[in-house]
Amino acid sequence: MGTLSEASQVKSNEASAQDFEREPVPAHMRKKWLSMSLVWIAIGIDLSAMFLGAELGNGMNLSDSLTATVIGSVILGLIGALCAFVGAKTGLSTAMISRFLFGNVGARIVSIVLGIFSLGWFGVQVGFFASNMHTAFDKLVGVDLPLGLLSFIGGLLMMSTAIWGYRSIERLSVWSVPLLVIFIGIAVFTAFKTKGTAAIWQPISASPIPMGTAISLVIGIFIVGTVLSPDIGRWARTPMHAVTAAFIGFFVGNSFMTVIAIFLSRLMDTDDLTNIFIALGLGLPAIIVLTLAQWTTNTNNLYSASLGFSVVFQRVPKKLITIIAGILATLLAVFGIYDKFLSFLNVITSFVSPIGGLYTAEYLLVNRAKFTFEGIDRNKNWIIRSLIVWVVATLFAYMTTPAPDGFGLFQLTRVPALDAFIFAFIVQWIVGKLLSKKEEQKG
């Protein structure tokens, strides 16, 4: 009896250690919506949202900046819920879902793109972390730490949880979100106590930001995360758990830090969040917030990259893929990819956003029946129509992106990434309905 019990325990431990990167997450391993929403909230609480909120606070009056944040976050929540629904129904990662869209070989190209861009974004965010941590240490203790060293330390820290997969990220999020809320709450309370409420109603001190531009900034900063939401959504106990967790996670996660930064920037009359914390006498909380905010967000970037590369390198263990990818991305940060922040953001959103429109249209409106793991190896090597729509939608994003980063030919929603998502969704629906039956007959 003891031997059987031990064997059962070993199997249970082995199952709990798996991340199911190339197969559906089993039903008995799936999670409830609350813990999943904390993961998405933790991802949304990052330095990018903090600095966006500070920019909005300085460029808009209080009511307009809050309105833009709420509208943008609702749109993100809806897109994230839609994409997470597909992840929960299939139990598969974004990269694995792409096999139904692009074919078994075509999906490898898409997975390489997802992996490379996620790695690059990991490097950018590590650089972001290093730059702000450098400022914090310089102001607090007068120590001028090299950016390369801070990037290296930050990269290894953020890699540590991604190596162990979703459940490690979940534990980090469950512990870090309450801590972040407490320390950020202390900062807001201290700022109001020090400055009073009159400051938040003061006229703007920078060039005004139009409402449309503000909404586009709120959406653009997080839309790639919504496209990759099946990576988390596949762990949901039911599709409704995924939809609920994604909407709450993206709405609260994206808006929380932005709204906090709006208030702090108006109270303190500066858009430098690191200096705001230090000016309030909150040096240690500043370091904790900087660390946890980037750690919880950026570990997910590496996690998504490793899931993408797991589809390409199918015989290599995911942990090894994560370690190699994490080291490479950390080196990118050490050598200054952070300096290319805006250019890289434009490229990644143009290429990745259409993929979300493609797989949601294909699953919801074209051919849901083919999204079965049992038949995935019988897929064609190439599904040309989806590859063509992806390329055209990416070009469409560049057409709506203002010069010099894009062609600037016209505007749709003022958010090129959202333009690409909508365009890909509509075109994939139309083309898919026209051609999918012919594909089945030929197959």
Per-region residue spans from a language model:
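Membrane-interface "cap" regions at the ends of multi-pass membrane proteins
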Residues: 1-63, 209-215, 234-241, 434-443
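Hydrophobic, membrane-embedded alpha-helices of multi-pass small-molecule transporters
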Residues: 33-49, 189-194, 203-264, 278-299, ...
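Extracellular loop-to-transmembrane helix junctions
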Residues: 55-84, 106-110, 250-251, 419
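Hydrophobic transmembrane alpha-helices that form the core helical bundles
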Residues: 107-141, 295-311
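Transmembrane alpha-helical segments of multi-pass small-molecule transport proteins
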Residues: 111-112, 138-164, 178-188, 210-226, ...
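Membrane-interface loop-to-helix entry segments
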Residues: 130, 149, 153-191, 205, ...
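C-terminal membrane-solvent junction of multi-pass transporters and transport-like membrane proteins
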Residues: 358-429, 434, 438-443
